[in-house]
Amino acid sequence: MVGTAIASFFGMLAISTIYGLAHTFIAKSLSEKISQAWAHRSARFMILVIIAIQGISAFILYGSSLYLLYQGATFTPYTSDYGTLYDGSEDITVAWIVFGLSMAVSVVADIIKVILVLTFAD
């Protein structure tokens, strides 16, 4: 399971990198509107609150995902009394689910931020 956990880690890293590059491209194309929206105090406050929520939740969920990958990689396989083999793949699957939830929170937060920027831009 160590190989699967390492491959999953690099897969998660690649997905995060691709999302970060797309985010950078969108931010550059909206830079003028972001500057206009930043002039409004209420927009600035709402955007900062969303950024804080996004950062805290992403940190917790991504950290949980990495911990689950670690658990799956270091799991000692065993067979139950009913013949089912437990090998740690459940932890790796749950890690992917938690990572997907983390990415979903980031996407929703970024969509809300874009809506706020476009609403408050002059």
Model-predicted segments: where are they?
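Transmembrane alpha-helical segments in integral membrane proteins
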Residues: 19-26, 102-121
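N-terminal signal-anchor/start-transfer transmembrane helix
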Residues: 8-31
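Alpha-helical transmembrane spans of integral membrane proteins, capturing the lipid-embedded, hydrophobic core
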Residues: 9, 13-17, 55, 99, ...
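Hydrophobic alpha-helical membrane-insertion segments
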Residues: 49-66
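Interfacial non-cytosolic loop connecting adjacent transmembrane helices
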Residues: 2, 34, 65-97
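Membrane-helix interface and helix-disruption motif detector
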Residues: 1-7
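Amphipathic, cytosolic membrane-interfacial segments at TM-TM junctions
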Residues: 28-48
